[in-house]
């Protein structure tokens, strides 16, 4: 690929709720761009993008496969790197990870379901990473499909600025095609060629007025972002050319000022080519993005890199996958410079140079070998020994650390053991590999019981992990019952003097600190340790202060009630003293750990549990039962709405501890007619009676409360 083709590159992802038809849409894109010969249907478990066996069985997408494809638009051939992201709440890490490296996204919605809870979560994640997007309303052929209602919801629920650039011709089973408001033509797809052919005709007479009205709204919206267009819009809108509209829409989209909206039915092969055209027309290329900013690991200074192959190399590893044929594949996005097969590249986290033996561009899980991956492109490499998700790969002579991604902490854990003791090594090897791939999945050994506990974002997440252990690593596991990841907090401030002295012949140990330990300030929102140093006059030498801080940070991993980590803590180091010979960094660290244990026991320790934001869609007649059941589960109903299809939407906050097996219970209450989705919201204090029960179970005693 020539260097100047970067403006024809699009790194995009499709983000959506579970059933918005995201994988089907990706499949159609691959079909029309000529990469797949037979369309893979999710219904029959043959979709090319869903390449792990469990995905094909469950019909949901778990790992974002990165696929490179090409599309001709307006006389140019565009290169599209397509990242398929999962929509299930348990897989937020995958979504965060892919959004970090995209330039633009297609937000897919179901024309019947509209903006669903997960769509909201993903939308906010895309805002966080400043990803411009266009929206695609899928499933226009389904009964209850309503494009304009989804436009309204995008405004109301997401606070977006939607701008329809097409309107549907018909809906539900009469959905025939689209009116393109930019070209002012009607597009009809041919069923006999699976939608590969379509005809462009005049707009049907009964839609002319509606099309003119929506075109006018579109022009008014984009004219705000283009002065020349604004003048024409007020003088004589009929003189506005197609090129001017496309240019203004592109600028407004790249600035994230508007979200162009399209619609179609991927399953019925209608609307996908228009979507591809407008991906090329409106979404940014790597050149539209600002220079990537990172920090120099040696000096801590901020540096930026241009999206050009001539600049020094910088790339971000965004996914690690184990492939049965080539071993460990590392997916990365190159921001500047280039990575060549057979060359050495520096990892700024590990401080080591690694040889990239081979490079691939992926088509789903088939690899096409390439020699070089340049700035603005996405690819995968083999040969890395020590690499984690979020690592920066760069030039050893010009090291840089790009902003990594932050992932939510796991909320649910289960103890696992292999069915046969001889599989113990296989299990620990498998778990270590899976934890490398997925930052929201953690493995630890419970100190009291010696059991291996795996933690993740939900029951489905852990089911899939156990399933993968069986398939990929051939280890069958016994599982304990799910455990909630509680946290602890303290409610009072305690002033304490702690002295640590040890004489054991020769040089001793000595540290003396006076601290105030209590809850964090209200404006300290990031959690963790808030450390304030108020020591005057060198009573504790400067070099020992970080050791005190480190001691508290280490100690916070184990609370005094039941060993759960402390959510947040404020420590003010007021004063202290030291011994010129016996004091060292370790003495002050141990002193801080002792101070923590003694102070927290007196500081009103409480237990905190994860609270989930739950949304249940249920038929009207089951409403009472659903709410009654939520009350039994200590749920707080926060609101009820009616959906267009006549169902009721119940929104509630419910403790995770009460939600195990909820999907099955809900099915029973509503005879399988209700659906639910839940996402972690926050940790909240547990009432003392429940805290006592939890402590009895975990510690066998509850006398600390």
Curated annotation (Swiss-Prot):
Residues 291-312 are annotated as: Disordered. Residues 7-287 form the tr-type G domain. It is found in: Cytoplasm. One of its GO terms (cellular component) is cytoplasm. GTP binds at residues 16-23, 84-88, 138-141. Gene3D superfamilies: 3.30.230.10, 3.30.70.240, Elongation Factor G (Translational Gtpase), domain 3 (3.30.70.870), P-loop containing nucleotide triphosphate hydrolases (3.40.50.300), Translation factors (2.40.30.10). It comes from the Bacteria. Residues 302-312 have a biased composition (Basic and acidic residues). GO terms for biological process: ribosome disassembly. Transmembrane segments: none annotated. Keywords: Cytoplasm, Elongation factor, GTP-binding, Nucleotide-binding, Protein biosynthesis. GO terms for molecular function: GTP binding; GTPase activity; translation elongation factor activity. Pfam families: EFG_C, EFG_III, EFG_IV, GTP_EFTU, GTP_EFTU_D2. InterPro entries: EFG_II, EFG_III, EFG_III/V, EFG_IV, EFG_V, EFG_V-like, EFTu-like_2, G_TR_CS. Catalyzes the GTP-dependent ribosomal translocation step during translation elongation. During this step, the ribosome changes from the pre-translocational (PRE) to the post-translocational (POST) state as the newly formed A-site-bound peptidyl-tRNA and P-site-bound deacylated tRNA move to the P and E sites, respectively. Catalyzes the coordinated movement of the two tRNA molecules, the mRNA and conformational changes in the ribosome. Belongs to the TRAFAC class translation factor GTPase superfamily. Classic translation factor GTPase family. EF-G/EF-2 subfamily. This is Elongation factor G. The gene is fusA.
